[in-house]
């Protein structure tokens, strides 16, 4: 593999998901300077299909992915599922356990390697709180998925 650029796609996605509104200015400037595409959003459900739908809708709406291209959608789905596994500690069906969740997400698409032949990559980051169905007793959780396009 080629030498990495100074901008790391997973780190950028994690920071974008974790920083509060108004704090992400420097990250957004870096993404724009690199001609990388991105989107952010929130999801309050733990059902995997709702998480996937929220992220997929945002990524299409902000033109991070082209919904008509299989390779774009395939890469996005794999990155989402990997991020969900991180947040849920591998137990994807948490919606059935009546867990509470408040997650922010970020999707970043770009070319993190100097070698152009390495192509584009996509990163999905999830950050927020998850816990038992007792408001106020949630804990933080984070997940990251990265896939080539």
UniProtKB/Swiss-Prot annotation:
The keyword Lyase does not apply. Pfam families: HutP (PF09021). Keywords: Activator, Histidine metabolism, RNA-binding, Transcription, Transcription regulation. The keyword Transcription regulation applies. Disulfide bonds: none annotated. One of its GO terms (molecular function) is mRNA binding. One of its GO terms (biological process) is L-histidine metabolic process. Homohexamer. Belongs to the HutP family. Antiterminator that binds to cis-acting regulatory sequences on the mRNA in the presence of histidine, thereby suppressing transcription termination and activating the hut operon for histidine utilization. This is Hut operon positive regulatory protein. The gene is hutP.
């Amino acid at each position: 593999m080629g030498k990495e650029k100074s901008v790391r796609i997973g780190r950028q996605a994690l920071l974008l998901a974790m920083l509060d509104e108004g704090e992400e200015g420097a990250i957004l400037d870096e993404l724009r300077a690199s001609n990388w595409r991105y989107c952010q959003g929130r999801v309050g459900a733990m059902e995997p299909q709702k998480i996937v739908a929220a992220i997929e809708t945002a990524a299409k709406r902000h033109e991070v992915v082209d919904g008509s291209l299989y390779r774009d959608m395939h890469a996005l789905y794999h990155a989402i599922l990997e991020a969900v596994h991180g947040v849920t500690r591998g137990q994807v069906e948490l919606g059935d356990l009546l867990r509470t969740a408040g997650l922010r997400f970020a999707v970043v698409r770009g070319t993190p390697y100097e070698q152009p032949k390495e192509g584009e990559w996509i990163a999905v980051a999830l950050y927020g709180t998850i816990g038992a169905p007792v408001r106020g007793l949630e804990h933080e959780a984070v997940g990251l998925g990265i896939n080539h396009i």
